[in-house]
UniProtKB/Swiss-Prot annotation:
Residues 1-42 are annotated as: Disordered. The keyword Transferase applies. Pfam families: Choline_kinase (PF01633). The modification N-acetylalanine is found at residue 2. The keyword Transferase applies. Belongs to the choline/ethanolamine kinase family. Disruption phenotype: Hindlimb muscular dystrophy. Hindlimb skeletal muscle tissue exhibits impaired phosphatidylcholine biosynthesis and increased phosphatidylcholine catabolism, with concomitant accumulation of choline. Mitochondria are abnormally large and exhibit decreased inner membrane potential. ATP binds at residues 75-81, 104, 146-152, 244, 264. Its EC number is 2.7.1.32, 2.7.1.82. It comes from Mus musculus. This is Choline/ethanolamine kinase. The lineage of its organism: Eukaryota, Metazoa, Chordata, Craniata, Vertebrata. Pathway: Phospholipid metabolism; phosphatidylethanolamine biosynthesis; phosphatidylethanolamine from ethanolamine: step 1/3. Substrate binds at residues 77-79.
Length: 394
């Protein structure tokens, strides 16, 4: 996700001081399976990509000519634009510089410059701890990251018991990290309030967005959600806040037992544990590889069953509770409490991404049915809210 202000979007010029000799269309390698819409890079942006690689990576990147650099889309996100930049084989390495990197260009800006600075700091810390890709360069329009031989998980793989358990363990470790950021859990409602205000401040031409606000009484509903969550105990931990299949890489390391890596930390913050787990469960429903409008497929019946949730929860708690000895009764009590916590915070996930997508519809140039997606999330919100209020345990 990108933040408030001006950002680089698909096809937009980003300027640069390179000579205006034409970049040739370097042949891209076989495309990596796209989770979302891939984006092309304009000629001006290609020149700028060359300049960033040359300046921040040095070595062989300074020797390659602009037309020799391969810049290929890898997987279009709903927030950022991602490209794989590669050196040609005939240009030898000089030292330890990478031969290929991931270029991330911030898309429609929703957060603010301060958030981008914090994200870059966070990214660097996680890289130093070997919990994320290496960071090679940061600039106002984006950054250069380590390109990892890997693939993102597919939506259907989230329900695989082995992978689900591994994701739970990875999430628990992430939650256990100490990070140099505010520990006050203001991110969730602070961000949703900002999104709602930005939607309400849209020009009168943005009628569909305003209709959504009125149709679902979003301001009143947010207050109702806040009251519900105020009455729902949930530990404040360092959360990823967007653990969906596209942000979980399966590394190409067959000999490694720990071959999952979380990426894309732009939403990460101290937040309520229930949101991170509930949000992940919501993502079981949405497949973003659908090739026709609106470029996603929602399958509400794929939301994890009670048993699938318990499978995840038990792996999560096993990591969190290492060294603790609990009675069977106490263990069951923790599991039931966490089930309720997650069911309530999953509502916040739908509400958050519904607002986010409503706002993106007015800003993003990425080909995606943002308004349709927003409506789907709000509909699922009310459906799950109804199930929650009718449940005896709620």
């Amino acid at each position: 996700m990108a933040a408030d202000g001006t950002g680089v979007v698909g096809g937009g010029a980003v300027g640069g001081g390179l000579p205006k000799d034409g970049l040739q269309d370097a042949k891209c390698p076989e495309p990596i399976p796209n989770r979302r819409r891939a984006s092309s890079l304009s000629r001006d942006a290609q020149r700028r990509a060359y300049q960033w690689c040359r300046e921040y990576l040095g070595g062989a990147w300074r020797r390659a000519r602009p037309e020799e650099l391969s810049v290929c889309p890898v997987s279009g996100g709903l927030s950022n634009l991602l490209f794989r930049c590669s050196l040609p084989n005939h240009v030898p390495s000089v030292g330890g510089e990478p031969r290929e990197v991931l270029l991330r260009l911030y898309g429609a800006i929703l957060q603010g410059v301060d958030s981008l600075v914090l994200e870059s700091v966070m990214f660097a810390i996680l890289a130093e701890r070997s919990l994320g890709p290496q960071l090679y360069g940061v600039f106002p329009e984006g950054r250069l990251e380590q390109y990892l031989p890997s693939r993102p998980l597919k939506t259907q793989e989230l329900r695989d018991p082995v992978l689900s358990g591994a994701i739970a363990t990875r999430m628990a470790r992430f939650h256990g990290m100490e990070m140099p950021f505010t520990k006050e859990p203001r991110w969730l409602f602070g961000t949703m309030e900002r999104y709602l205000k930005q939607i309400q401040d849209l020009p009168s031409t943005s009628l569909p967005q305003m209709n959504l606000v009125e149709m679902y009484s979003l301001k009143d509903e947010m207050n109702s959600l806040r009251k519900l969550l105020d009455d729902t105990p949930s530990p404040v931990v360092f959360c990823h806040n967007d653990i969906q299949e596209g942000n979980i890489l399966l590394l190409s390391e067959p000999d490694s037992d720990d071959n999952l890596m979380l990426v894309d930390f732009e939403y990460s913050s101290y937040n309520y544990r229930g949101f991170d787990i509930g949000n992940h469960f919501c993502e079981w429903v949405y497949d973003y590889t659908y090739e026709e409008w609106p470029f996603y497929k929602a399958r509400p019946t794929d939301y994890p069953t009670r048993e699938q949730q318990l499978h995840f929860i038990r792996h999560y708690l096993a990591e969190v509770q290492k060294g603790e000895i609990l009675s069977e009764e106490e263990q069951k009590k923790r599991e039931e409490e966490l089930l309720l916590e997650i069911s309530r915070y999953s509502l916040a996930s739908h509400f958050f991404w519904g607002l986010w997508s409503t706002l993106q519809a007015s800003m993003s140039t990425i080909e995606f049915g943002y308004l349709e997606y927003a409506q789907s999330r709000f509909q699922f919100y009310f459906q799950q809210k109804g199930q929650l209020t009718s449940s005896p345990s709620s």
